[in-house]
């Protein structure tokens, strides 16, 4: 006999089965890749994408949304794009790019995404921060009044740099720009200033050499190296300065001092130009996009000296009574000394001064090849140590007068005594400003050298023996007046007792004749 089912039983059975089915609904914003070329992906069908948002692609690859158009999104791939295909699924993440930050990064070499590339294992950093951030406002800033010693007599005496300043280092290729910046990093050993060195578009061998030199000089322990080498994509070179800045800001926000070197921003601008042209953005002067000024201004404005209130607010009261600072040394490479090109003029107008390095001076053996006439520090004077400020006033004047007189002396057959003395003093000052690479000088030694040349103690020393005399003088003071040297290095003060000690020590050394 056939079993008959009531319609109500059938209905109950269907309801039970429906209730037993477990469905989970997940809202996703997905699109599909329509083209991939030269590190740029075009994605159709993505809605509600934010400018600068991370877009997830297959194989754990991410892209950065830069062009938001009516029907599609133009994004730049961060990393390898060879495995991407037309039709691949792209998803929004709702996040912007973040990199690891913290003291765990000190002594490490990372790429633009904060991933370690030095073979020393994982970083162990527990915190991350977005690469793009609004610069501190006017209310949160403090004036620059503490020095950053570079260890170079010519810079610390004539073009002083303060904590929180942006000082441009500009010059042609092979004029010693990187050498100056690396020596400044080495000189921060023992000062408590943390350093970040960002290598943009450089040869990997050059970066490896810099890391080795930092390690040899004991400076890698307080330094983070961010490397986006020439072999990496334009996207990595474009974001690397922002990533490095974020790593430096970590220390500034917690009431510490940091120094960041961007080497160099010319290559970042070229990488950004490449990305912009591939995204079909309209080109402007020198084919750069219209927002290339903003590219650098939003980066360099993040370097600042911030107040105690800012640090206290940022740390929720964990750190009180301390100011923080991020000092920036951006480097720009010029072509045949043309500082009126687009990118150099932009960065000159953004920064608080510039150090011009000249090919002619470099080839003449004057290294660092600083042109004191057109180099300037707009805010660093307030940050100079007392002793250097007191003694260095005559240096710039001596050099300026020497250059003027040297030009006239070429046409004069005989010179009066005063002119001849000025020329000889200028020659000695120029010679004394020379300094070897990887040999930054302490405040006391700088002060001693400047005092000796200003007071005429070097007038009877042959020019070709000046540097040997200087080396011997420093060694003499270290042996006979070590306590005074330590006091000057720690306080930077100047008084009559120090002057008397300088006079006596220099005269004693000259009588020994051991130079």
Swiss-Prot record:
UniProt cross-references to InterPro entries, sorted A to Z: ATP_synth_asu-like_sf (IPR023366), ATP_synth_asu_C (IPR000793), ATP_synth_asu_C_sf (IPR038376), ATP_synth_F1_a_nt-bd_dom (IPR033732), ATP_synth_F1_asu (IPR005294), ATPase_a/bsu_AS (IPR020003), ATPase_F1/V1/A1_a/bsu_N (IPR004100), ATPase_F1/V1/A1_a/bsu_N_sf (IPR036121)
Assembly and interaction partners: F-type ATPases have 2 components, CF(1) - the catalytic core - and CF(0) - the membrane proton channel. CF(1) has five subunits: alpha(3), beta(3), gamma(1), delta(1), epsilon(1). CF(0) has three main subunits: a(1), b(2) and c(9-12). The alpha and beta chains form an alternating ring which encloses part of the gamma chain. CF(1) is attached to CF(0) by a central stalk formed by the gamma and epsilon chains, while a peripheral stalk is formed by the delta and b chains.
Main location as per UniProt: membrane
Name by which UniProt lists this protein: ATP synthase subunit alpha
Name of the top EC class for this enzyme: translocase
Keyword ATP-binding set for record: yes
Residues in the signal sequence: none
Listed SUPFAM superfamilies: C-terminal domain of alpha and beta subunits of F1 ATP synthase, N-terminal domain of alpha and beta subunits of F1 ATP synthase, P-loop containing nucleoside triphosphate hydrolases
UniProt-annotated binding residues for ATP: 171-178
Organism: Xanthomonas oryzae pv. oryzae (strain KACC10331 / KXO85)
Catalytic activity: ATP + H2O + 4 H(+)(in) = ADP + phosphate + 5 H(+)(out)
Gene expressing this chain: atpA
Record keywords: ATP synthesis, ATP-binding, Cell inner membrane, Cell membrane, CF(1), Hydrogen ion transport, Ion transport, Membrane, Nucleotide-binding, Translocase, Transport
EC number, UniProt record: 7.1.2.2
NCBIfam families according to UniProt: atpA (TIGR00962), PRK13343.1 (NF009884)
Function: Produces ATP from ADP in the presence of a proton gradient across the membrane. The alpha chain is a regulatory subunit.
Pfam families: ATP-synt_ab, ATP-synt_ab_C, ATP-synt_ab_N
